[in-house]
Amino acid sequence: MGIRSFRPYTPGTRQATVSDFSEITKSKPEKSLTKYKHRKKGRNNRGVITCRHRGGGHKRLYRLIDFRRDKRDITAQVTAIEYDPNRNARIALVQYEDGEKRYILQPAGLGVGDTIIAGEEAPYEIGNALPLYKIPLGTEIHNIELYAGRGGQMVRSAGAFAQLVAKEGDYVTIKLPSKEVRMVRKECYATIGKVGNAEARNLKLGKAGRTRHLGRRPQVRGSVMNPVDHPHGGGEGRAPIGRSGPVTPWGKPALGKKTRKKKKQSSSLIVRRRR
């Protein structure tokens, strides 16, 4: 993937950068692997806003991604690399020997014509899915299962990878992109390689309109609101917040307050917390 910039015809084009989409080989998605996605716009079942600053955005079709990789010991060939509006990573359309088609996250280095396979005896190659106990130490992996058979839940964003650092008993230890080190059951599957499109983090939106296309609405600072709307609001001109520390619109401590449950069951599997 390359990054394009523009001549400064407008303030928006002066700042913006976009992907050149050079790796995309197919423009329209596979119809059988898409479904309509009803967007919540930050509302719950009663229509009450539960997540602020969400709404609008371009309509999208959801691509059904195979995170489970549960079609075992059957070779598949990559037939296309596609754009997915629901994530920064690219997706690869693969076709199995029996004719079935599926989408997977495109690992860096996987292209059209390459073959992949999932299974305990799968070779050690990019795009193949294996149980963690079969993967050599130091390997870069992604799409990692937390529970065997549930499908990959960790390390799925563009450019992300984790590293296998130890194997002991029924667990393996992995180092996550957040620098957290945690243990996972050895039967859980992971895919070899790192997720492609790592340059996505370097893109600049350049203008408010592109942010709105993504479904994000403006964020208004609490300090410029009225006291009825936010605890930081009110005062004459630029006033301090008038509290010992910043709080949420509902008065709870914000910015630095730990929110993880102290008795969370998975805490026993975390060797080192993220920084």
Swiss-Prot record:
Compositional bias (Basic residues): 208-219, 255-275
Polar residues: compositionally biased ranges: 12-22
Protein's UniProt keywords contain Ribonucleoprotein: yes
GO CC list: large ribosomal subunit
Region of interest: Disordered: 1-24, 208-275
Keywords: Ribonucleoprotein, Ribosomal protein, RNA-binding, rRNA-binding
GO BP terms in the entry: translation
A GO molecular-function descriptor: structural constituent of ribosome
Organism domain of life: Bacteria
Function field: One of the primary rRNA binding proteins. Required for association of the 30S and 50S subunits to form the 70S ribosome, for tRNA binding and peptide bond formation. It has been suggested to have peptidyltransferase activity; this is somewhat controversial. Makes several contacts with the 16S rRNA in the 70S ribosome.
Subunit note: Part of the 50S ribosomal subunit. Forms a bridge to the 30S subunit in the 70S ribosome.
Family: Belongs to the universal ribosomal protein uL2 family.
HAMAP family assigned: Ribosomal_uL2_B
Record PANTHER family: LARGE RIBOSOMAL SUBUNIT PROTEIN UL2M (PTHR13691:SF5), RIBOSOMAL PROTEIN L2 (PTHR13691)
Protein name (database record): Large ribosomal subunit protein uL2
